[in-house]
Design a protein with these regions (language model features):
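Short, Lys/Arg-enriched N-terminal segments with co-localized hydrophobic residues
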Residues: 1-5
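A conserved beta-strand-loop-helix scaffold within acyl/acetyltransferase catalytic domains
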Residues: 8-83, 179-198
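Short beta->alpha linker loops
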Residues: 14, 118-119, 172
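Short coil/turn motifs at secondary-structure junctions
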Residues: 66-68, 88, 121
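A short, internal acetyl-CoA/4′-phosphopantetheine-binding micro-motif in the GNAT/acyltransferase core
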Residues: 80-90, 119
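Conserved active-site alpha-helix within GNAT-family acetyltransferase domains
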Residues: 108-112, 118-136
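Amide-forming acyltransferase catalytic core, primarily the GNAT-like/NAT-type
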Residues: 131, 135-198
């Protein structure tokens, strides 16, 4: 009888697309448009570690490269994303093995630090990850937009109200959004991820 062996390896860039089906299984809430964008743009220059068993990818961890501004210095860093294991292979320590392997590689490359946005903070606490910020999210309801539209139709409308444009961001807007954040907010923080058009 053949023994099933778990194998950890870093994929060649040409193999990155092999992880897409696992992404779609585990992160089923992601839209088709987002997954298309991610696998067309982000996987061009990222690093993907996988665990294979029976010659199939069973788990993955992706590292997306970013430049991070630490006060006045700019340093390379990786954002851990796409940590996923097929449902029937969970509970075998695959995530732990991938994380340790990736962090050891980063250490040998003298990567100053890495970051992530965990589904649950407790998952990564044993690996010395610590909470550094809380992401604020604001939802504007239909009443906000309706009131603004009624007000815009008024002859005495406020000029500042006219500056608000509500539409979905497009891929071509990414560069402008990154420049806006850099120009208006980067001086407010000691640590900030430098954004670009991608």
């Amino acid at each position: 009888m053949r023994e099933n062996k778990m194998k950890i390896r870093k994929l060649d860039q040409s193999e990155h697309g092999k992880t897409r089906s696992l992404w779609e299984q585990v992160f089923s809430e992601d839209s088709q448009e987002f997954v298309d964008y991610y696998y067309y743009i982000k996987t061009k220059d990222n690093t993907i570690y996988v665990i294979e068993e029976d010659d199939e990818i069973r788990a993955m961890l992706q590292l997306n490269p970013y430049q991070v501004k630490l006060q006045e210095s700019v340093v390379p860093s990786d954002y851990i994303v796409g940590v996923a294991t097929q449902a029937e292979y969970r509970g075998r320590g695959y995530m732990r093995n991938l994380l340790i392997h990736a962090l050891q590689d980063q250490y040998s490359q003298k990567m100053p630090f890495t970051f992530l946005m965990p589904a649950a903070e407790a998952i990564y606490y044993p690996y010395d990850f610590r909470f550094v910020y809380e992401q604020k999210q604001i939802e504007l309801d239909e009443a906000f937009f309706s009131a603004r539209k009624e007000y815009k139709n008024d002859e005495y409308r406020n000029i500042s109200q006219e500056r608000i444009v509500d539409r979905d961001a497009r891929f071509m807007d990414a560069g402008k959004m990154a420049a806006f954040v850099e120009e208006n907010f980067s001086d407010c923080w000691n640590v900030v991820v430098l954004r670009n058009a991608q």
